[in-house]
Structure formats: structure tokens, C-alpha cells
Amino acid sequence: MGNYSTNISDNQWQFIKKSLDLGNRKRKYSLRMIWNAIMYLVKTGCQWRMLPNDFPKWQLVYYYYCKWANAEDFDLLLSKLRDKERLKRCQNMEPSLGIIDSQSVRWGNNRSLNGYDGNKKVKGIKRHVVVDKNGFLLTVMVTVANVYDGKAVELLMKTLFYFLIPVKVILADGGYRGEIIEQIKNKFGYLIKVVMRNDDKKTAFVPVSMRWVVERTFSWFDNDRRLCRNYELLMENAENMVKLSAIKLLLNKI
């Protein structure tokens, strides 16, 4: 087995194994090797078929990736890692504050669905995310880039509600103004608070209070080459890669 920097440590593997109840059944290839392969792919951005020979066959790695994704194991692991880190920081395990924003990403696969974001001048997809006050991912939804933030927010809130995340207030930018705020409050109980930049003061750049946290999360995503462009044919896979990037970030804090 190659000694890659993305390989999972003993402590990290014990946490994954316990969180997902993977057991100790003997296999030809250990599940730890499968996880190492997935982390390598997310970090380097290589194709499934281009995984090094140090790892199990790519078909087997992809099989487990699909199995865990369909079973929502990535969501479960992300939740447990986030809870662990919040407790470590002496914070409540369940976040009450969220920050919402979107990131337009250029497409890298001619067969994938894509749109054109006229604001950012980007042709590709758009990642809609909600993070907690630390910048840790709560939920993600991927659409084509021409979907307006205000139109995507209801489906994003539906996903947040599905995972029973008890957020009370969600900070947003001006793209989420309008009737949708009242609709979200009535339907899901989330209060979306629009925080705008004060343009009256012509001074040096000052980050908008708390909202800068989600921008930092987007910069964390860009550290993983798989997320620098969208190479996924399916939107679900694009969402899973974001979750895996967030998992990798939190695993490194163990």
C-alpha cells in the first residue's frame, strides 16, 4: 500500500468504523483501503479508472462509494464528525445558526448538465450550501449554474429539514430576498436573515460579519482538485464529492 498523504490514520479509521458500524468481517481488500482510495481521488481529482495500482480495483472502490452514498452513510459520518468537533470547541452539538450561499463552478465534463451564471460569468454548475458558524457543512445541493439562489433555497431547506438539523436562524446575502423568506419560515420554521454590505463607507475591504465563514468553506473545497471543476455526470455525485471533501477536512481534526 502506497504511503500517500491522504491515507487515513489509525484513529481516523477507528472513528469511521465505529460511526458506520463496519464490523470486522474478513475481506480480500480491507474497507480502510477503500476509504484511502476515495480520499486520494477527492484530493487529487483523478478519474476512477486512473486510481493507482496500490489501491483495490477501481470497480470495487466505486461499488463501495455507491453503496455508502445510497445508504446515506456519508451524511451520517459527516454529522458525527461535525458533532465531535463542535463538542471539542465547547459548543452545542446541534447548531442553531446557519449561513447559506452558493458557488458557481466551471464544468469539466461535456456530457454533464450545465447552465450559465450571468452574474459570475461561469458556465457549469452551482453548489448551494448551508454551513454552521465554524464553516462546517450542514447540507449541500447542486444545480445547473443558471438556477437563481432564491429558487433553489426551498429545496435546500427541504434537505436541511430532512436531516433534522435544528437551525433557527440562517444568514444570507441579497440573493435570498423576497417572499421566499416568509414561505421558508411558514413551511420549515427557519428564519432567513439577509445581511447586506454597508456600501456607504468607502473604506478598505471589510468582510461581512459571519457571512465570510461560508466563503472560507468554498476556499476549503478548492483545496481538493476534484471540486475545482465539476467532472461529475450526475448531480448526486457532485453533492457526494462535496460531502467527502467536508468529511476529509473534519477527519484531519481528529
Residues covered by each model-derived region:
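Short alpha-helical elements
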Residues: 1-254
